[in-house]
Structure formats: structure tokens, C-alpha cells
């Protein structure tokens, strides 16, 4: 029986302990425990409290954030709806029905009181976005923008409610630039100008970097001119660098060189990077203003010094000013490696030989940077296209003798060196590189390496070495139906020597690799030339029969006038009169434009 009394006493104590009086109205009591919810109802008409019951009155100004499983949440559920505080549902009580408008204001103010700053911003922004959602659509890219930036951009477009500034636009443009949305970026900068909001260097840097990314040199050039002429903004180093890169990627070497020299000779770029002289608002300073600003800044520093020896101070300051002016005049030191690399690449694409060599040697003499493989490949390619094998050998020997640069030598550099030698048929030097340098540097020749050497052998009619290289390519599986040049060079090395059997072998390999019909016809014609020089006219007729069979199988394949000329010569030399007359009539009926050899045969056989 005592246990029963103790049980009831414990329950009563527990109920009393769970009660708390409100600090504002002592008669209003509410419970913390859910299972005591319906025990006492002090005031039925009382509105439901908006704040969760575990909050004390003294903590209303600060809403704590709790953490659970490394994720944060606040007192409001993530799915909460702000409109619920307006009591628009059907379950409004009698108290709210009496003064609905007052209740809305009261509850919304109370709700805002318990919100932190980010929740207040979301609460206001959602209403604005609902009104302005139909005015402008945000570009949907493959990597869509975060929701926060979408809201920022929508707010920028709703200019009636938001006072957009250059800083706000730059923030949105930065997000757009990271996502790569060029059309949205151009739309943003157009909106800035339409609202008379002046873009700054950051704005132009963001939009120009996207133009550089997508190789839109025309758009970048228009924006660059607008920045200088319309907005009166002097480009800084980064703007110059972006434009040089843009011109280099599109192969416009002349424009890349023009901007490179402007960057070199622009004193304000040097000033912004090292002298730290503030620009005027309209950015219209000239070289005299630069010197005046330097003197003015140094005179201000001079006034702050408490030194009685004015003459010595003046001399020291004058020397200091002179050194700064000399630094501005000596602008080559400010050019960074990336700009040298881009302008050298542009010179190579545009085949500007002298300019490319000039900038490459400047880069070497500066001593600040070590050229990368990219720069070496471009400069050797430029040398090979112009056939300057002497300078190519000079650069190559310097690379090879320098342990820091030797590691940069690769197959592409050796190929370009061989290409420069092939233009002048320097076979001895080319063979020395082929036999020694590849092995010494532990490099394996690729398809292009064999092709360059085959071209050299074809020029000097060295069919034996050419055929040997061709067999090596076949063994190393470097031959394919995508590249016909090794086949042509090998056959051409046999044309003047009359070694037709080598040419026939190369032709059979090409047929096994399933070359296209037109490519095969080219190889057939070169093989027929080799047969003509070796007086093997019967082989020419046999090859012609193969071409007839190919034409019957593929109606799109047509034998050209060069092939018919070789066959006509074979009929003439073999005294096959009727076949000669028939083929001659076919040539006349088709109204071909006769090559010199065919015209000669016609003139020699008028009475045939």
C-alpha cells in the first residue's frame, strides 16, 4: 500500500516540476512534456505559440544551431513555409478571425524577430522572385548555377526593387564565369551598360576570360575596344595577357605581337605592378603624368621626414625618382613566361619566322624562365618550316649540352630537325641523327620520323634504304590506311631507277590495308611510272585490268586521264593498234584536258 502512495506522490511531483509560469503573464501555464498536453487547458482561446517550447524568453534574440550527424539545423524545419505564419489555412481560431490584418502584422513581426539574417533575406527574396520570375530566365547550362546566384541574378534584373551596383554585377559575373555561361555573361555586361552602370577592370576581365576559353577572338576584340574607347579604362597586365592568349589560340600572330609590344611599352602596367601609384578616376594619365605622380608621392614622403639636411634628402630622392623612371623605361622585365609562350606559338602558327626567333632568344637571355617543351617544339617547328637547319642544329646542340634542357628533347624536336634537313637534302646529317641521336636519348622513332627520312630518300632515288625503312614500318605496325605518304615516298624512290618490283610490293601492301579507291589510284599511277621507266609495259596493262575490275565493282570510282595516258603509251609501245585506237577515241569523246604526255602521243600518232 505504501508503494502505491509513493507512486502517486512521485507522479504529482513530476507534474508540478514540469510546469513553468510565463514571465509576462503569470496565469498562463504551458507544458514541456507532450504526454501531459491535455491535462490542463488554462486558456482555450489562446493562440498557439510560434516558438518551440524549449526556448526561453531571454534567448529570443539569438536562435541557436544544433548539429546532428555533421549536419546543422535550426528551430525551423527545412520544409517550413513562411506563409503559415499568416494564418491562411482553414483552421484559424476565433481569436485570429477577429482581427486578421493585425494578426498578420503581429505574427510576421514576431516571426522576423526569431529569424536570423539569412532567413530574413530568403523570406524577402522569395516574394520578389515570385513577382519577377516571368521577366527574365536564367540560362540553363550543363553545370547549372547555385540557387543563391540565380536569386542574385534575378534580383539584379528586377531593377525597380534592387539598386544594382558594379560590385553586385561583378559577383554575379564571377559565378557565371566559373560555370562557363558565355551568353549570360554577355547579357549581364549588356545590362550593366543599359542601366548606366560602368563596368570596371574586373568586369572586363571576367567576360574576356570566357571569350578566351571559347576562342571567340572577334567578340573579345570588340569588348577590348569598348573598354578602352568607350569606358576609358586602361588595360592592366591580366587584360593584355588574356587578349594575347586569345589571338594566339586563333593563330593571329600579327595581333598577338601588336598587343605584346603594347604591353611591353605601356608604362601604366609597370606602374600598377611595382610603383603602386594610384590612377585617376578617368584613367587618362600619360607619361608626363606618371613622372609627375612619382615626384609628387616622393615629395610627400619627404615632408614627413624630420631631417635637417634638405640638400642630401633632395639628392637621394632625385636618385630614387630617376631609378623608378628607368624601371618604367626598361619594360622587358615585366613580361611573364606565359606571354612569351603564347606569342611564340602565334608566330609559329602564322609562320612569322623572324619575330618568333626574336622572342625566343629574348626569353633565353632574360634568365628568369626555363622554356618548356611546348616552347621548344614550336620554335623547332618554325625553323623546320623555313628550312633553317643551321639554327636548328645550333639550338639542338645547346639543348643537348645543357643538362637542364636535355631532358626536354623529345621525338617531336628530332622530327622537326630532320624536317629542316630534308628541305636541303642534308642526308648525311639526317642519317647521323637517325642512327645515333634516337638511341642516345632513348627515343623511339614514330610514324612521322620514318616518313621524313623516306622523303629524303625519295629525293635522292635511294630505293634500297627507302624500301628497308618501309619494311621496318611494316614490322613495327606503323603502316595504316590513314596515311598514304610513306607508300608514295617509297614508290617515288623507285620511279627513276626502274625497280618496279619494289613498287608492286608497296602497292600490294596498300591493297591489303584497304585504302580508299582514290588513294589506290594514286599509287597505281606512281607504280605505272616506275614500270614505264623499266620498260615493263605488259605490267602496266595488267594493272589497268585491275583498275577496270575495281571500277565495275564500285561505280563511283573513275579512272582519270593520267592513268589512261600511261595505258595509251603501253598500247603504242606494244604495237596494240586496235586497243590504242579504241582508247584514243574514248579520251576524245570524254573531252579530257590532255596532259603534255598525252598530247605528245596524239601528235606522234596522227596517221596511226
Swiss-Prot record:
PPR repeats lie at residues 165-199, 200-230, 236-270, 336-370, 372-402, 410-445, 446-480. Its main location: plastid. Keywords: Apicoplast, Plastid, Repeat, RNA-binding, Transit peptide. The keyword Cell inner membrane does not apply. Transmembrane segments: none annotated. It is found in: Plastid, Apicoplast. Binds to apicoplast RNA transcripts, preferentially to the motif UUAU, and protects RNA transcripts from degradation by ribonuclease. This is Pentatricopeptide repeat-containing protein 1, apicoplast. It comes from Plasmodium falciparum (isolate 3D7). The gene is PPR1.
